[in-house]
């Protein structure tokens, strides 16, 4: 360490170096996927700002096959003129200078989103490559950046009569530990944005899978959002309460809400289109006005007198779905990620607007007002009944925390952070778990049968369920709005351990429904896990081994197959064995698995045949004859191997503007024709690169007289696939394989060793990435309405390997 601390010790990070040095400050976590997806949102927010200013109608977000993302819009296009101070094009300034852009000039954008206020320059800094295309002033301008540095100045490459911007970026693997984009995370945010910006069309296209795209365009704005949130639920009143008010101080307040016959409160808050997960002053204002207005209306109309029970704000919000969206010129948030709004002036703005408009709505719609008041009174009565039920059970002593439920085998550890609670299905598995556990920090709670489906049950009915009451007591954090306190939780590791059969899956789903609906904070804090007991036990001779899943089973079979095996590529060649053969098998299996994954988008036979076809590079596509020869060879191989009803033909498409010829494979099956074009993105993708690498390894590997040997047995082979298949078949001789259905099939030692020992066990942590999606999924799968559930099963049945209905 340097002894001198002087002016030379002070480092000034110039330009975008600061972003690359500390990416988390600018974009969020670079390991868990949040930062990666924020890259897309930063670019989309620029297009949304154009839409807010009235210049943009269509936004298209595309996840390309090479895992790059492009965002294009039909806005005004980023200015291309020279910047007076920076002496480069304005577009280059926006791409390379932090905090540059139109948001800081109040005349360009009145309110703007942008999650971290740093914009597209951060995306540029954290990408291996960015291609910027601008349609503006009758010209198409383009510029390419690598790691934030422009390769050349902005150049004109053609003429156009359109306007708009397209930014395509390849995230840097040096910054992000995982560069795989999740469609659902992008879809959730883009859906929100389309609701919040009525009339803007947002398309999301995933080129990695066939026909996977969504078109989000909602004319109804946040009214349509509420309608969407209440899909598969039964509204109490058909009419959606809605107002949009712009105040003189520049704050605009928009609220939409509707009650349904459920028991959950669903309120989503936004400031300048940015979601606040933890609410803030706008939520406080909304809640205060809702409670005050409804209470005074019920007093005035005599509902409170008839009810004979006092109503609270919680009763008013039972079954309420609401979206609160405020536009604030200079919002203040509690942190950089803007999860909570702290601008004090917003509370009074929302409260006064909401109070005034809700009063008008109740007076002008007496029949709807009556239905809402009846629902609130019902909620108050149920709350009162639940309170009495709790008091009754307390008096009996069953729910008194001094006496924990008799079934619970508690642990000695008193620190919740170190304690684990295993929720086990059935008494037999419970017995094994109690004997096999580590008493110091592992508690066991066996549950008998299936617990109540809390999605369909009211609170008082839920409390009267014996299994639910046992679970609540064991957890120790109480339940219900008055008593629930997640900080009092007795175990910070709650592990659901059920059998690997249909009943086990059902019980696990019922438990997850309970946690999601009644104790969502436990999931949000990462306390809920699902145990992953082994699926198989294999026995060969006297050796026994546990195998966790199908993939591990395949790996085990391969390792067994390679034992004492050797491949001879011709009659005279030395044996290929040991590590060299293992490496080849691993590469082959990885290629086959990759081809299976790619066959979601392309025909399975086509993708698998690429493993046996020479590589076609993007550069070769400038030579039409080379593309013709490659495509012809591929199609001939496909037709030669086809045993079904499919016929293959091809075309070579000329893309004159790019100077490229690209292959198109045509598949005709039972008179139906499908065309599959192989794009430049496909040829440049990592996936195709891996298949082509494998094809180069296999090409010419086996010659005349090649054979495979295992022990003393041999077989002449003509392909590597044939050799591997024979090896696996040979290795399975004398092997018994037992599939575990229930945890009770294991003795205590086996259960400890495979599922409960912290050194060797595997667990899945339960998380919620898309709150709206999770809510809808629980409503569809666990709610009262049968039709949406049937539709869900029909749509997804083919995606499952083992379906039991």
Swiss-Prot record:
Please share the entry's free-text remark on the cofactor.
Binds two Mg(2+) per subunit. The magnesium ions form salt bridges with both the protein and the DNA. Can also accept other divalent metal cations, such as Mn(2+) or Ca(2+).
What Gene3D superfamilies does the record point to? 3.10.20.690, 3.30.230.10, 3.40.50.670, Histidine kinase-like ATPase, C-terminal domain
Tell me the compartments it is located in: Cytoplasm
Chief location of this protein?
cytoplasm
**Keyword Transport annotated:** no
Where are the residues marked Interaction with DNA as a site?
Answer: 450, 453
Q: Where is the Toprim domain?
A: 419-534
What GO molecular functions are on record for this protein? ATP binding; DNA binding; DNA topoisomerase type II (double strand cut, ATP-hydrolyzing) activity; metal ion binding
Q: Which PROSITE patterns does the record associate with it? A: TOPOISOMERASE_II, TOPRIM
Could you list this entry's UniProt keywords, alphabetically sorted: ATP-binding, Cytoplasm, DNA-binding, Isomerase, Magnesium, Metal-binding, Nucleotide-binding, Topoisomerase
**Essential cofactor(s):** Mg(2+); Mn(2+); Ca(2+)
A GO BP term here is: DNA topological change
Task: Respond yes or no to whether keyword Cell wall biogenesis/degradation is given for this record.
Answer: no
Q: Which GO terms describe its cellular component?
A: chromosome; cytoplasm
Give the E.C. number(s).
5.6.2.2
Which reactions appear under catalytic activity for this entry? Answer: ATP-dependent breakage, passage and rejoining of double-stranded DNA
Q: What class of enzyme is it?
A: isomerase
Residues that, per the record, bind Mg(2+) 1: 425, 499
Per the entry, what this protein does is: A type II topoisomerase that negatively supercoils closed circular double-stranded (ds) DNA in an ATP-dependent manner to modulate DNA topology and maintain chromosomes in an underwound state. Negative supercoiling favors strand separation, and DNA replication, transcription, recombination and repair, all of which involve strand separation. Also able to catalyze the interconversion of other topological isomers of dsDNA rings, including catenanes and knotted rings. Type II topoisomerases break and join 2 DNA strands simultaneously in an ATP-dependent manner.
What does the further note read? Few gyrases are as efficient as E.coli at forming negative supercoils. Not all organisms have 2 type II topoisomerases; in organisms with a single type II topoisomerase this enzyme also has to decatenate newly replicated chromosomes.
**Family recorded in the similarity comment:** Belongs to the type II topoisomerase GyrB family.
Q: Outline the subunit composition.
A: Heterotetramer, composed of two GyrA and two GyrB chains. In the heterotetramer, GyrA contains the active site tyrosine that forms a transient covalent intermediate with DNA, while GyrB binds cofactors and catalyzes ATP hydrolysis.
What PANTHER family would the database entry show? DNA GYRASE SUBUNIT B, MITOCHONDRIAL (PTHR45866:SF1), DNA GYRASE/TOPOISOMERASE SUBUNIT B (PTHR45866)
What is the name attached to this protein's record? DNA gyrase subunit B
What lineage is this protein's organism placed in? Answer: Bacteria, Pseudomonadati, Pseudomonadota, Gammaproteobacteria, Vibrionales
Gene this chain is encoded by: gyrB
